[in-house]
């Protein structure tokens, strides 16, 4: 048996000021237009502060069991969280089993499940109310609960050799259901949360990844993922894509070096993915999808250590194992992407 445990705590002190407004102007009038006054289309104000404390603890026990069918590894444990802001206690039990079959030690299969909580941080607490003047004001929601999800992951690894080189193929299928979910929208680099447990959602997908050393000492890999992630209001309504949904993703990393100069490594990275959803301002039910994201990067890394650089063997550098200089060209082809 292997038993692990830990406890941590932190204190938080946050002060926040927000002032936003939107004015829609046209030739001779602004929107909204009543013919007499100039009105803002949207305005938000907020001055808030928060003091809170968090305590977290975890315990995990791992047991290995050898049988005629192979080696079994059972892991069971859990996390416990408490936050002074809403006085919520969050127990999170988890378990997994891993099997290394006796008939083929190059395989490994695993199954994991658990109840997970994502405790909110300050930005997620910001609820809104609209006053008589039409100004939206920030209020902190003390009744906001942690988002809760049930997850199941089934996966496996296969170790093999091809062309005289080691490879590893990893596959994982997953599903999660989320309730007490807090909806949010993404506007460029701004993430705006609703401040309420107003949604539910689910996600499911498949991840495939092949690792290999095409040249000794330099890892390369290729991966493909497909997934679906949907959410809807908790009181019903249409399922819409979650802001991070990308239904397919293909990526690759290839590394190589000169045999006469192994400390100089070159790498090529490729990424092709479906564009993520976008939404109309302050209306998440009206949405579209960005074009496909595609990029190729090329780079080089030079590693300095005691074997490759004389100055690294000096007494002044005895506490430094190695350091590196990296040069990289992003988006080598110059494709135009929407972000």
What are the residue ranges of the model-derived segments?
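Face-selective signature of the C-terminal outer-membrane beta-barrel domain
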Residues: 1-86, 170-173, 221
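C-terminal beta-signal and adjacent terminal beta-strands/loops
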Residues: 272-279, 302-339
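Short loop/turn motifs that connect adjacent beta-strands in outer-membrane beta-barrel proteins
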Residues: 1-2, 65-72, 101-107, 161-167, ...
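Transmembrane beta-barrel strands of outer-membrane/channel proteins
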Residues: 5-11, 76-80, 97, 111-115, ...
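Gram-negative outer-membrane beta-barrel transporters
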Residues: 65-69, 174-177, 196-278
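Membrane-embedded beta-barrel scaffold of Gram-negative outer-membrane proteins
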Residues: 102, 143-202, 325-330
């Amino acid at each position: 048996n292997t038993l692990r445990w830990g406890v941590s705590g932190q204190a938080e002190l946050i002060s926040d000021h927000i002032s936003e407004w939107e004015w829609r102007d046209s030739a001779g009038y602004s929107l909204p237009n009543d013919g007499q006054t100039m009105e803002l289309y949207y305005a938000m104000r907020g001055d808030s502060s928060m003091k809170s404390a968090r305590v977290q603890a975890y315990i995990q026990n791992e047991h290995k069991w050898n049988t005629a069918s192979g080696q079994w590894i059972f892991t069971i444990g859990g996390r416990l969280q408490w936050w002074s802001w809403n006085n919520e206690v969050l127990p999170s039990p988890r378990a997994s089993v891993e099997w290394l079959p006796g008939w083929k030690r190059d395989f490994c299969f695993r199954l994991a499940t658990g109840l997970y909580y994502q405790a909110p941080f300050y930005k997620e607490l910001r609820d809104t109310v609209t006053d008589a003047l039409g100004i939206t004001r920030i209020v902190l929601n003390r009744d906001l609960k942690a988002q809760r999800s049930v997850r199941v992951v089934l996966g496996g690894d296969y170790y093999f050799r091809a062309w005289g080189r080691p490879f590893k193929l990893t596959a994982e299928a997953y599903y999660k259901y989320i309730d007490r979910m807090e909806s949010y929208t993404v506007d460029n680099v701004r993430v705006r949360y609703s401040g309420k447990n107003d949604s539910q959602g689910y996600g499911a997908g498949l991840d495939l990844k092949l690792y290999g050393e095409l040249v000794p000492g330099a890892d390369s890999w290729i991966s493909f993922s497909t997934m679906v992630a949907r959410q809807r209001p908790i009181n019903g309504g249409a399922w819409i894509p979650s802001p991070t949904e990308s239904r397919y993703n293909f990526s690759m990393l290839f590394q190589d070096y000169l045999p006469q100069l192994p400390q100089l490594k070159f790498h090529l990275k490729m990424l092709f993915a479906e564009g993520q959803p976008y939404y109309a301002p302050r209306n998440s039910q009206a949405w579209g999808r960005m074009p496909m994201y595609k990029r190729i990067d090329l780079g080089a890394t030079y590693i300095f250590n005691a074997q490759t650089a004389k100055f690294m063997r000096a007494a002044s550098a005895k506490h430094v194992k190695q350091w590196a200089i990296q040069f990289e060209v992003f988006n080598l082809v110059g494709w135009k992407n929407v972000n």
